[in-house]
């Protein structure tokens, strides 16, 4: 699609579950020019909710290119918006604009994570890089598969194989489950009550 139909396609990918998939390869690795990647260490390291995440964008990217191609009046409006940050707001990278916008531009000097969060993410990243044989990754994938299978084994239904399944989440139709084990009357009760 990017090569043949839309070279200016902007792709935003959330790779948070990629580490749970044995053969995952990010769009960031394939088409970095077009991809903004969001990744969180939280689920992989059992720290869900701690907001240990990063946004990655290639130095040369379609987002910056498209901003530079905006009509003059739009570029001037953007230059005015970011003029408090730099003497050359027209050169401000898209990723820096995101940081500024996340802090409502005027509070940009407060941007970033706290030192404990930065240290924690640094340790998570170092740990992952030092695990050359991916033992932790394989263990996490095995735990997720085992938990998913245990859940489904206890529903009375068979989990259909899916080579693309990560298994961190699953959907169970509770009305189908209720009908199978408790009948239509219970299903009607659930529908009326919930």
Task: Give the positions of each predicted feature.
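PLP-dependent class I/II
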Residues: 1-194
């Amino acid at each position: 699609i990017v090569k043949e139909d839309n070279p200016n396609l902007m792709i935003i990918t959330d790779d948070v579950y990629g580490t749970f998939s044995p053969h995952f390869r990010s769009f960031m690795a394939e088409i970095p020019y077009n991809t903004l990647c969001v990744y969180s260490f939280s689920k992989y390291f059992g720290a869900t909710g701690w907001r240990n995440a990063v946004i990655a964008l290639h130095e040369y990217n379609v987002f910056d290119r498209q901003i530079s191609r905006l009509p003059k009046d739009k570029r001037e409006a953007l230059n005015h918006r970011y003029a408090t940050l730099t003497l050359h707001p027209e050169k401000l990278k898209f990723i820096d604009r995101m940081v500024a916008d996340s802090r409502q531009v005027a509070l940009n000097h407060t941007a970033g994570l706290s030192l404990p969060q930065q240290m924690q993410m640094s340790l998570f990243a170092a740990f992952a890089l030092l695990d050359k044989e991916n033992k932790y990754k394989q263990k996490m994938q095995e735990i997720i598969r085992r938990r998913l299978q245990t859940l489904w084994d206890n529903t009375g239904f068979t989990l259909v194989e899916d080579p693309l399944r990560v298994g961190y989440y699953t959907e169970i139709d509770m009305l189908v489950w209720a009908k199978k084990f408790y009948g239509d009357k219970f299903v009607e009760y659930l529908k009326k009550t919930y």
